[in-house]
Amino acid sequence: MNQQLNTTRKSTAARGRMGLVGGILLVIGTCIGAGIFFKSERVLQNMGGNTTLALLVWLMAGITVILMGLALVEITAKAAFDDLALLSWTQKFTNNTFYKACKRFLIWIYLPTTFFFMPLYLVQSLQDGLRGFGVANHFNTPHDWAIWMVIVLLINLWFFFTSGLSVKWTSVQNVVLLLLKVIPLIAVVILALWLGASAEQMERQPVVPVKDFTAISPFFGWFSAMGAIFFAFDGFYVSAAAKTQLKKQKNYRK
């Protein structure tokens, strides 16, 4: 009887998990952060308006992100302690004091701020998109901030509750969000090439000097820009634990 019950539980758990394709899409959707849409202008400002330095920063940061992803693939493919991703690695490779400090930081600071700022970035993207198409991005009331805050809270509550319903439902939501992030990325490249080809017909805007500590010299701006780019891909640490939700995990260990 107990053996039959255990078999039923295992089969139910397996059905609740995602397949390999769903896992790949989850990792891609998590790693492509919405922050990348806000960082290009900031990176250029940190470089003092120097396009060449900005391109070098993006190139170096992109290579670093790829290498970091490959390193995490090696860790998660061969380690049996990745259920909690970063926390599991901290517990395994560091002392107990550092592990507890990391755990408290993630629980009390990182997760609450992430749950707040990610929907806020989504709302900012929506506002920028509406403004770009000439559509009003406000409600024309003196309390617009409160309305947007309610929208952010509703988005938080929606993902907080629906993500825990089932892995399948989470995968569907991830595919939708992935499309919403990938389509603008492709569209931006196409628009940039098209606008670049007709640059002679565009009115050039003067470069306004940035009065910021990070823009005093390219040295400070370089590190500030690196941090801004890395923030857009910080989903690596979360997505590394996705393997625990895959079906037939042993087939994907190597």
Curated annotation (Swiss-Prot):
Tell me which UniProt keywords the record has, alphabetically: Cell membrane, Membrane, Transmembrane, Transmembrane helix
Q: Which residues cross the membrane?
A: 18-38, 53-73, 105-125, 145-165, 175-195, 213-233
Please indicate if the UniProt record lists Membrane as a keyword: yes
Q: Which GO terms describe its cellular component?
A: plasma membrane
How is the protein disposed in the membrane? Answer: Multi-pass membrane protein
Principal subcellular localization: membrane
Gene Ontology MF: a single term:
transmembrane transporter activity
- Give compartment(s): Cell membrane
Under the heading InterPro entries, the entry gives: AA/rel_permease1 (IPR002293), APC_superfamily (IPR050367)
Identify its protein family.
To M.pneumoniae MPN_308 N-terminal region.
> What's the protein called, per UniProt?
Uncharacterized protein MPN_095
From which organism does this entry originate?
Mycoplasma pneumoniae (strain ATCC 29342 / M129 / Subtype 1) (Mycoplasmoides pneumoniae)
